[in-house]
C-alpha cells in the first residue's frame, strides 16, 4: 500500500472513461443536448438496485445525481484477499472524511456476485468492517450488475482478464456528477491521498469551506 502514491492516483485519472466522455460529448453537433445528459445516457443506466438495508434505489436518480460519490466493485467471497484489504482501506478514508460522508459525499460499493451477496450478506459484511453511515453496499439482478460494471469502466479489453472477478476490485472511481468531474485511483492508495485527490472534485467555495 505504501508504494501506491498520489502520483499513481493522478495518473489513473487520465484513464477514467467517464471523464473522457465529457470531452467527446463537447464535440457533438446537437447543441440542445448537454454534455451532462450525454454522459448520463452513456455511462449511468438508471437500474434498480437493492441496498444492504433492503431498500430499492435507482442508480442515477437516487445514488449519484447531484452528488459527489465514490464507486467501487467487490465481492464478499473474494478469493485473493484484495476485497477485505480494499474495504478496510476505504473505511479509513471514510473516517478521514468524518461526517461529510452521507452529507455531501456518498460512498457506494457494488457486488460482483449478486447471486450470493444478498442484502443480508452485504449488511453483515458492512457491520464486520465497521462501515459508518453514508456508505452503501448494493446488489441487483446479475445482468444489471454486469451492465453497470461495464458502463462504469470496470472492464478490461482482454476477455480472459475481464472474466476474473478479482481484476475489477482494485480501482476506486470518484466523481462530482453535476460538475462532470470523474477520476480514479487504486483502492489501496493511502487514505490521505484519496481524500486529497477527491478535494479537487469540489468547487473553490466548497474547498475553502472544508
Predicted features along the sequence, with ranges:
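N-terminal secretory signal peptides and thylakoid transit peptides that target proteins
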Residues: 1-16
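N-proximal helix/coil linker or "cap" segments that precede and/or mark the start of modular domains
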Residues: 19-46
